[in-house]
């Protein structure tokens, strides 16, 4: 149905007592209403002038009776449409059959249009609201783009840094690019990132020329980077992010608070110094004590073991505040000395190594008690084990195993040792070193 300028639709039902056809119904509508009203409301004239639309009839013949649904579009006003609807109910015959006509509804088509307009306007407005960017977001977006543009690169390593890194008298050394960006958001532009735990040479040289603050994450990784910086760079102040947080995820208020609370490096050294020019790590005190497992106490005499392990504890648990090469040389010398005494000190380990060889199992000592498991079972229960006196595995010792166990045991023995970085408080031995 083409509604066009239609305002109302008249819905009508017709029941005829006999068989009639559609053209009989149309003829009855025009024939029986003709002359009832003035010429202004004559159906034929109204249809010719377009003030009423095409009359639509749906007809069914059931058990000798005819049922019709009639729709008549009207663009007349309310009064004229009501009169026209009432006129249709005067039809009492269709062809030769008696008939009854009843108006079921007069629909104001403009109501449905208004409802459509309301619903559509609501959806359009919602879309506009979703796409609209408020002033704050526009401002932040512009600032963010400027900060990203402000990130520069320093040195041959192309390290991310702030724009004031060259001209500022003081600098802040952070871990990565995200840290530099977060500090730029807070208006701090004299930052540079080391991009990893290995400190680039350009950072080492830069810290000698400028007042340097090391600003690291408040987690284990931050501690390791800080130790590396203290070993290799000329650090003046130390600042840490809140415990468990990273610099890149810290709010402006917290960042400024952490930087204001920075402490001189001498205070860090003083709090952790043993009086011989070395800085001890922040590991628990029990790790600094002699690390001889209880399992081996009966094998070795106290007079021989005690001085050897005290020396190891000092050398292995500390960070030398000297150039890296010298520190590495000193640690290697201690290990070499230990290797010459390995047969004497670890005679009891041979039995453990022999017991797990070619089995794929692991053996560890907890409170003087030996336990044997498959490696899978050991990993399942690792969270229940806080401290071990000793750990041996019939498999190569990888960096992952070292990272998992370095804070649980002082000694790890395996088929072979394949690690790139060894914690200073950990002793690593291969089967060949133990059996030799």
UniProtKB/Swiss-Prot annotation:
One of its GO terms (cellular component) is DNA-directed RNA polymerase complex. One of its GO terms (biological process) is DNA replication, synthesis of primer. The lineage of its organism: Archaea, Methanobacteriati, Methanobacteriota, Methanomada group, Methanococci. SUPFAM superfamilies: DNA primase core. CDD domains: TOPRIM_primases (cd01029). Binds two Mg(2+) per subunit. The gene is dnaG. RNA polymerase that catalyzes the synthesis of short RNA molecules used as primers for DNA polymerase during DNA replication. Keywords: DNA replication, DNA-directed RNA polymerase, Magnesium, Metal-binding, Nucleotidyltransferase, Primosome, Transcription, Transferase. It catalyses: ssDNA + n NTP = ssDNA/pppN(pN)n-1 hybrid + (n-1) diphosphate. Mg(2+) 2 binds at residues 217, 219. Belongs to the archaeal DnaG primase family. Mg(2+) 1 binds at residues 175, 217. It comes from Methanococcus maripaludis (strain DSM 14266 / JCM 13030 / NBRC 101832 / S2 / LL). Its EC number is 2.7.7.101. Pfam families: Toprim_4. HAMAP family: DNA_primase_DnaG_arc. The keyword Electron transport does not apply. GO terms for molecular function: DNA-directed RNA polymerase activity; metal ion binding; poly(A) binding. Its cofactor is Mg(2+). The keyword DNA-binding does not apply. Forms a ternary complex with MCM helicase and DNA. Disulfide bonds: none annotated. This is DNA primase DnaG. Residues 169-243 form the Toprim domain.
């Amino acid at each position: 149905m083409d509604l066009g300028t239609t305002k109302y639709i008249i819905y009508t039902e017709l029941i005829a007592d006999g068989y009639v056809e559609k053209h009989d119904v149309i003829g009855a509508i025009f024939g029986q209403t003709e002359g009832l009203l003035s010429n202004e409301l004559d159906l034929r004239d109204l249809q010719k002038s377009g003030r009423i639309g095409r009359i639509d009839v749906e007809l069914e013949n059931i058990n000798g009776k005819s049922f019709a649904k009639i729709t008549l579009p009207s663009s007349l006003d309310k009064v004229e449409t009501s009169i026209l609807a009432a006129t249709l109910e005067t039809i009492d015959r269709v062809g030769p059959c008696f008939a009854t006509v009843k108006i079921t509804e007069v629909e104001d088509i403009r109501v449905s249009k208004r409802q459509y307009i309301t619903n559509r306007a609501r959806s359009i407005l919602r879309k506009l609201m979703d796409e609209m960017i408020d002033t704050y977001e526009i401002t932040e977006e512009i600032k963010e783009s400027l900060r990203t543009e402000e990130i520069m690169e320093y040195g041959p390593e192309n390290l991310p840094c702030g724009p004031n890194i060259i001209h500022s008298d003081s600098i802040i050394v952070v871990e990565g690019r995200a840290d530099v960006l977060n500090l730029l958001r807070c208006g701090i532009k004299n930052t540079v990132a080391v991009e990893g735990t290995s400190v680039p040479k350009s950072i080492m040289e830069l810290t000698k020329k400028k007042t340097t603050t090391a600003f690291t994450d408040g987690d284990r990784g931050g501690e390791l980077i800080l130790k590396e910086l203290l070993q290799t760079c000329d650090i003046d102040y130390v600042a840490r992010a809140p415990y468990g947080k990273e610099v890149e995820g810290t709010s402006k208020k917290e960042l400024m608070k952490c930087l204001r609370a920075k402490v001189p490096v001498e205070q860090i050294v003083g709090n952790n110094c043993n009086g011989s020019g070395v800085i001890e790590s922040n590991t628990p005190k029990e790790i600094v004590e002699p690390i001889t497992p209880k399992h081996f106490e009966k094998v070795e005499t106290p007079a021989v073991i005690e001085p050897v392990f005290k020396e190891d504890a000092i050398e292995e648990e500390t960070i030398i505040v000297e150039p890296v090469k010298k520190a590495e040389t000193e640690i290697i010398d201690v290990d070499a000395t230990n290797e010459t005494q390995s047969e004497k000190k670890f005679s009891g380990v041979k039995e453990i190594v022999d017991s797990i060889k070619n089995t794929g199992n692991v053996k560890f000592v907890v409170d003087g008690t030996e336990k044997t498991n498959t490696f899978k079972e050991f990993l399942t229960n690792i969270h229940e084990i806080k401290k071990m006196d000793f750990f041996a595995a019939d498999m190569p010792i990888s960096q992952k195993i070292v990272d998992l166990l370095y804070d649980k045991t002082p000694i790890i023995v395996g088929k072979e040792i394949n690690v790139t970085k060894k914690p200073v408080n950990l002793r690593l031995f291969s089967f060949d070193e133990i059996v030799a």
